Amino acid sequence: ALVTAIEPKAYTDGHPKVRLLFPNVQATEKEYFKKTGVFPIMHAVAVRKDFAEAHPSLPKAMFSLYSRAKQVAYKDLETVGVLKVTLPWVNQELDDTRALMGDNYWKYGVEANRKELELVMRYTHEQGLVKRRLRVEEIFHPSTLKLTET
């Protein structure tokens, strides 16, 4: 199984051994979110621990910059005078997403994503990818644990 936002070439080329795990991915993901409140995390930003410790203001500054950039992207998507993508129902899709997930549908920060992160820790242990179940606090620099968006 492959979890990805972009369909692999083998799938788009119609390879007979490559198929979707769920026939209607969007409906399945939305139903899972309704039941669990979990939407898989898409990305994480990594900085070497020694570098973060040598530059103690860096983690917070990076978090702040990414948060501000996200707000710019949100505002850009909300601009309806000129569509940002050539999809006829993009505004309705944005409205539907907000109705389901709230205005901040890509949440930043450890606490805002704790449920998702704990599931990742559980799954990586259950699937044998790590020898012991890690705690969320073990994989993030201490200075980032309480950062929240403003």
Kindly give the residue locations of the regions a language model identified.
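Secondary-structure end/capping motifs
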Residues: 46, 51-126
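Generic secondary-structure boundary/loop-capping signal
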Residues: 18, 30, 36, 48-49, ...
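General structural signal for secondary-structure boundaries
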Residues: 20-25, 32, 90-93, 109-115, ...
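Pocket-lining segment of extracytoplasmic ligand-binding domains
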Residues: 1-78
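Long, low-complexity C-terminal extensions of enzymes
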Residues: 109-150
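Residue-identity detector for threonine
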Residues: 4, 12, 28, 36, ...
